[in-house]
UniProtKB/Swiss-Prot annotation:
Catalytic activities: a ribonucleoside 5'-phosphate + H2O = a ribonucleoside + phosphate
This protein's name: Snake venom 5'-nucleotidase
Protein task: Hydrolyzes nucleotides into nucleosides. Snake venom 5'-nucleotidases are widely distributed among venomous snake taxa, but there is a lack of information about their biological activities. They have been shown to inhibit platelet aggregation. This effect may be due to the liberation of inhibitory AMP or adenosine by its action on ADP released upon initiation of aggregation. Venom 5'-nucleotidases are also known to synergistically act in vivo with other toxins like ADPases, phospholipases, and disintegrins to exert a more pronounced anti-coagulant effect.
Gene3D superfamilies on file: 3.60.21.10, 5'-Nucleotidase, C-terminal domain (3.90.780.10)
Domain of life from the UniProt record: Eukaryota
Key words of the record: Disulfide bond, Glycoprotein, GPI-anchor, Hydrolase, Lipoprotein, Membrane, Metal-binding, Nucleotide-binding, Signal, Zinc
Cleaved propeptide residues: 565-588
Tissues where the protein occurs: Expressed by the venom gland.
Binding site for Zn(2+) 1: 51, 53, 99
Organism: Gloydius brevicauda (Korean slamosa snake)
Length: 588
């Protein structure tokens, strides 16, 4: 545990030392003030996680599969740090702000049993529901999580409708009062109201405005004599701040959904801080409310110390997310349980998903240089996974997908094993354990992304975008940055989907790998505003489910990515050079 550093005085010209009487007076004032604070104060330590996304095992620096020595997170390592902090602090709460579900093969196989097992083992005190907890429908939430959790699961803004209310009565609570030492702490949960678009909660749950519902329950807690209230939820950093400003009575906001990294000082790893930790928000009634998130994927453990006065006002808050790196050992008992469950994954990975009757070309020579049919299959699967809830204005809320060619790591041969596709083969195609996320982006930024896609085309570097719902024409004879000749996108606000020219000032929804959403492969223009970025499902789960549903697949090269005739000769020259580079890549 790091002790927060004291702020030093400003550096400048030497100052004369205060006289002894003045020092005594100042010391007396500070001593009396300290006594008055200590007399009625209560210190609470809040440990928190959010957006863990089924990272049961330790992961790489970028939260993919860990294959080397530089590994992070995992439930066993988190258990060690939690045990240490509980031993060193008197009043500790361990909270989760949602999206434990979805993200690795662990969830694909165990379907949440791994979540409830290890959250129970680590002794969580409360959890707010995230949108991904509904990915397997209400039934997949009810069993295993709701029925087997040893901790309260919260959301104040979810209202059941009709007969479903009796099925979940008592399982999803709006709030919970927890006795911490001699004090009562109220925790109110909330879930993004966009869940019906982002997941599969079904038609019988209503997701209401977070602020309105939180205020109702904060008022109720106040009437019950609770003056220390935490809002714990999953609606994103922007909404977390709105809650801090608007909801009277809420003292601390612990959030999730946008994978926001907050940190005071120099960050310990590759994440760039979106602000200080805690992020202080001035409420409309004049209070300073700390808002926190702890990035995602279990890489960090949020660590917030809050001091309340005897009236429940926050008088001090401090801390930082703790990087769970190799300097923290893994708890051996928890690790043994992880290894025991991991044995069951072996047979799962060899199961048949479906068949292909064509060669699924995921080679470097294909996907990094021109349109490839495996890239088309992947993006078509992602669009299919996100087709839901048409309305009068739109046939779907999103129509476009991109994936970088460098993220496609292997072909699948239709002549091997009679065209059978196994989970192991699909994992070889998409080995990084990433997700396909939803992003809102301006047309001008999307245009920049496609310029970046070919800014050094021919070098086999992996930036070339494979697409669905997009048609792009390039001219490689032009200078980098001006090579996009035309860019058409599939309309959503239409009854018959057709391709229309991209509008630079229009805001679009785009599906893309989490790697690109984080600015990977130089796509900094896609990183954008984290408040408009929603984490999605595991890539192999999306593609695997699509292949299962189709039974047999036969994706084609369809002219989604075209190089104009004037540049074909130039492209061939680049390709020859690129093949040499690719060979070196695989050798090294």
């Amino acid at each position: 545990m790091q002790t927060p550093k004291r702020r030093r005085g400003a550096q400048g010209c030497p100052r004369s030392s205060p006289s002894p009487p003045l020092l005594l007076l100042v010391g007396a004032v500070w001593f009396c003030a300290a006594l008055s604070v200590a007399a009625g104060s209560f210190e609470l330590t809040i440990l928190h996680t959010n957006d863990v996304h089924a990272r049961v095992e330790q992961t790489s620096r970028d939260s993919g599969k860990c294959t080397g020595q530089d590994c992070y997170g995992g439930v066993a390592r988190r258990a060690t740090k939690i045990r240490e902090l509980r031993a060193n602090h008197s009043h500790v709460l361990l909270l989760d702000a949602g999206d434990q579900y979805q993200g690795t093969i662990w969830f694909s196989f165990f379907k949440g049993r791994e979540v409830v097992k290890f959250m129970n083992s680590l002794g969580y005190d409360a959890m707010a529901l995230g949108n991904h907890e509904f990915d397997n429908g209400l039934a997949g939430l009810l069993d295993p999580l709701l029925k087997h959790a040893n901790f309260p699961i919260l959301s104040a803004n979810i209202r059941p409708k009709g007969s479903i209310a009796s099925n979940i009565s008592g399982y999803i609570l709006p709030y919970k009062i927890i006795n911490v030492g001699s004090e009562k702490v109220g925790i109110i949960g909330y879930t993004t109201k966009e869940t019906p678009v982002l997941s599969n909660p079904g038609p019988y749950l209503e997701f209401r405005d977070e602020v309105e519902e939180l205020q109702k329950h904060a008022n109720k807690l106040t009437t019950l004599g609770v003056n220390k209230i935490i809002a714990l939820g999953h609606s994103g950093f922007f909404e977390d701040q709105r809650i801090a400003r608007k909801v009277k009575g809420v003292d601390v906001v612990v959030g999730g959904h946008t994978n926001t990294f907050l940190y005071t000082g120099s960050p310990p790893s590759t994440e760039v801080a979106a602000g200080n930790y805690p992020f202080m928000v001035k409420s409309d009634d004049g209070r300073q409310v700390p808002v926190v998130q702890a990035y995602a994927f279990g890489k960090y453990l949020g660590y917030l110390n809050v001091i309340f006065d005897d009236k429940g006002n926050v008088i001090k808050s401090s801390g930082n997310p703790i990087l769970l790196n190799k300097n923290i050992s893994e708890d051996q008992d928890v690790k043994a349980e992880v290894n025991k469950m991991k044995i069951q994954l072996h047979n799962y990975s060899s199961q048949e998903i479906g068949k292909t009757i064509v060669y699924l070309n995921g080679t470097t020579q294909a996907c990094r240089f021109h349109e490839c049919n495996l890239g088309n299959l992947i993006c078509d699967a992602v669009i299919y996974n996100n087709v839901r809830h048409p309305d009068y204005n739109e046939w779907n809320h999103v129509s476009m997908c991109i994936v970088n060619g460098g993220g496609i790591r292997s072909p699948i041969d239709e002549r091997a094993n009679n065209g059978t596709i196994t989970l192991e083969e699909l994992t070889a195609v998409l080995p990084f354990g990433g997700t396909f996320d939803l992003l809102q982006i301006k047309g001008c930024a999307l245009k920049q992304a496609f310029e970046h896609s070919v800014h050094r085309h021919g070098q086999g570097m992996g930036e070339l975008l494979q697409v669905s719902g997009i048609k792009v024409v390039y001219d490689l004879s032009r200078k980098p940055g001006s090579r996009v000749v035309s860019l058409n996108v599939l309309c959503t606000e239409c009854r018959v989907p057709t391709y229309v020219p991209l509008e630079k000032e229009k805001t679009y929804k785009l599906l893309l790998p989490s790697f690109l959403a984080g600015g990977g492969d130089g796509y900094h223009m896609l990183k954008g505003d984290s408040s408009n970025h929603s984490s999605g499902n595991l890539d192999i789960s999306i593609v695997g489910d699509y292949i299962k549903r189709m039974g047999k697949v036969f994706p084609a090269v369809e002219g989604r990515v075209i190089f104009s005739a004037g540049t074909l000769f130039q492209a061939q020259l680049f390709l020859t050079w690129g093949l040499c580079i690719s060979l070196l890549y695989f050798i090294l």
